[in-house]
Amino acid sequence: MALELLAIDLGKRAFHIYGIDTDGVILSRKVSRAKLAEVVGDLEPTAIAMEACASAHYWARCWLAAGREVRLINPRFVKPFVKGSKNDAVDAEAIFEAAMRPTMRFVPVKSTDQQDLQSLHRARDRLICQRTALINHTRGLLAEYGVVLPQGPWRFMAQAPTAIAGADLSDLARAIFGELMGQLDDLDRRIQKLDAMIVTLCRTNETCRRLAKLPGVGPIIATAIVGSVNDGRQFRSGREMAAWIGLVPRQYTTGGKPRLGGIGRRANHYLRRQLIHGARHRQPVGQA
């Protein structure tokens, strides 16, 4: 079959492909993971469309290496084209229809370096969440023994050992809190190790070094931006990028009457959070 466009509904073990050849014959079939590359190679489509979901960037790099055009679509833009109940075949057809729209916006394919950066940031964020949860857990247990510590992870880590040593605790309680503080120290060392890796990567990447010169931007924000948008060529202006991150007001305009609400809060939640933290650090809240 001569296919100009092939849509693939991605999965872990089972995939569904959908396409229409030049004679109008519809191709819709289920393909196993082991056979996907072989089947796509036999069909030789000019372009391949997929949702920008789990493993999409891996497969996109595979198809690009094989000389195919790749169109990654935000799942939110595919949903309006789903007809009837959801299943793999319907999803693949919806991806095909969405990819054919002349005004459709596509997601740039991430390189392995970008995905490495994103994985590093996600691992660091997970460790920070675990540390915060453990601090709150330890703080709550200490309060049951009359030990109240100030807010903030750094003040907690600095004052907790002294407070525990001076508290009237049983041997068992001291052993419990010693174990919890040991876990906190281990998490802190792991976070510092990942921080050092981020600083090293920032120094070796030209785009990161340029971004780090901006006010309120350091290695963490610079590498997070590069990991998410690379050099930003997909945006026509800085405002477009701000809208993509979700930093501009949500708009609901009808009948010629504009309505603006709070920030959109869509897209990359992690990047938006880091940028807001950087802005607050540069200009603390309440200071003009």
Where are these regions (language model features)?
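A detector of single, family-specific signature residues
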Residues: 1-288
